[in-house]
């Protein structure tokens, strides 16, 4: 049996009671934190709460050589992930691999950043369009900096339908956790290059450390927000589309947004 367990958003205490019981009953416990991680804890704290050794897996262990799956043929194996366990396509692929090997699987869900963002900002979850991810720039063969324009295009498309865009920020082994500030600067660089009016007067909302006791939620114009101090990671970004009057009020009251956004409402 292979049980996928979502750990929630921030620390070891975000796990559900059902998830905690499954971990305690498991013969082996594995975890991966390269798709998402819990910034308020570490493996040692998890092991103390769970009473079990947590074996950390690399990207290669999960995606290329998941030999550890064989243990689930005749043992109870728990696989831990940040957030909700099936939001990442990596985990869907892993589940399908297990099923093809004849291994029974089950899911125990956890809190997801996609629902937490709606709760923290007041933006209605059914008004979100396609999400986007901003990677760090890379250097071309000619030595020039290459910035992905795909997130800009996604925001543009969603905005044309009045929809909000949830923007995931890169987690890089060498460069670390991308901040809201870097993400906005990259989007504004693309705006400067293309001049299509997507980001120059756009309202954005930055969220830091969702799930913690003191998350930061700040709304403002992208140009202004890029200088705001969001503090430690993890960060995530939202670029709202057309605002319902309750959403606009929430951004002003709950995210310290500018009063002018009350004018851009349905």
Swiss-Prot record:
Pathway: Protein modification; peptidyl-diphthamide biosynthesis. GO terms for biological process: methylation; protein histidyl modification to diphthamide. Signal peptide: none annotated. It holds the Pfam family TP_methylase. S-adenosyl-L-methionine binds at residues 9, 84, 87, 112-113, 169, 210, 235. GO terms for molecular function: diphthine synthase activity. Its EC number is 2.1.1.98. It is an enzyme of class 2 (transferase). It catalyses: 2-[(3S)-amino-3-carboxypropyl]-L-histidyl-[translation elongation factor 2] + 3 S-adenosyl-L-methionine = diphthine-[translation elongation factor 2] + 3 S-adenosyl-L-homocysteine + 3 H(+). Transmembrane segments: none annotated. Keywords: Methyltransferase, S-adenosyl-L-methionine, Transferase. HAMAP family: Diphthine_synth. S-adenosyl-L-methionine-dependent methyltransferase that catalyzes the trimethylation of the amino group of the modified target histidine residue in translation elongation factor 2 (EF-2), to form an intermediate called diphthine. The three successive methylation reactions represent the second step of diphthamide biosynthesis. This is Diphthine synthase. It comes from Methanosarcina mazei (strain ATCC BAA-159 / DSM 3647 / Goe1 / Go1 / JCM 11833 / OCM 88) (Methanosarcina frisia).
């Amino acid at each position: 049996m292979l049980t996928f367990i979502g750990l929630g958003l921030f620390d070891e205490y975000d796990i559900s009671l059902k998830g905690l019981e499954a971990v305690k009953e498991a013969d082996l416990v594995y975890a991966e934190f390269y798709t998402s991680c819990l910034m308020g804890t570490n493996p040692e704290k998890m092991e103390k709460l769970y009473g079990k050794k947590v074996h950390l897996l690399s990207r290669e262990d999960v995606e290329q050589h998941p030999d550890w799956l064989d243990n689930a043929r005749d043992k109870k194996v728990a696989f831990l992930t940040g957030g909700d366990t099936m939001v990442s396509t990596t985990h869907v692929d892993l589940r399908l691999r297990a099923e093809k090997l004849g291994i029974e699987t089950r899911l125990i869900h956890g809190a997801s950043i996609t629902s937490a963002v709606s709760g923290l900002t007041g933006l209605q979850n059914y008004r979100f369009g396609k999400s986007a991810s901003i990677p760090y720039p890379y250097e071309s063969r000619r030595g020039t900096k290459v910035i992905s324009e795909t997130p800009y295009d996604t925001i543009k498309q969603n905005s044309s339908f009045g929809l909000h865009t949830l923007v995931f920020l890169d987690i890089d082994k060498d460069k670390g956790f991308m901040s809201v500030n870097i993400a906005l600067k990259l989007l504004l660089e693309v705006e400067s290059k293309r001049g299509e009016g997507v980001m120059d007067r756009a309202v954005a909302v930055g969220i830091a450390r969702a799930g913690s006791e003191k998350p930061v939620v700040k709304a403002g114009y992208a140009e202004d927000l890029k200088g705001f101090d969001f503090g430690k990671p993890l960060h995530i970004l939202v670029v709202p589309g057309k605002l319902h009057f309750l959403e606009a009020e929430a951004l002003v009251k709950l995210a310290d947004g500018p009063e002018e956004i009350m004018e851009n409402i349905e």
